[in-house]
Swiss-Prot record:
It comes from Anoxybacillus flavithermus (strain DSM 21510 / WK1). Pfam families: Hfq. Gene3D superfamilies: 2.30.30.100. This is RNA-binding protein Hfq. The lineage of its organism: Bacteria, Bacillati, Bacillota, Bacilli, Bacillales. RNA chaperone that binds small regulatory RNA (sRNAs) and mRNAs to facilitate mRNA translational regulation in response to envelope stress, environmental stress and changes in metabolite concentrations. Also binds with high specificity to tRNAs. Residues 9-69 form the Sm domain.
Amino acid sequence: MKNTINIQDQFLNQLRKEETTVTVFLLNGFQLRGLVKGFDNFTVLLEVDGRQQLIYKHAISTFAPQKNVKIEIE
């Protein structure tokens, strides 16, 4: 069976492990800036100014990290 690469999970996991500050753009235009503390198939847990916010992935447009994220996509 061929292993499938899940870029989304790798990207979010690197943001979490490296504690990289990220700006999350929502579909309604709202922006949140904070740290990814966890994620699953449907949600992302973001810490913003010391407070946790659970964001549904279907409401997210874009993740913009402060620095480049290294992931393996081979």
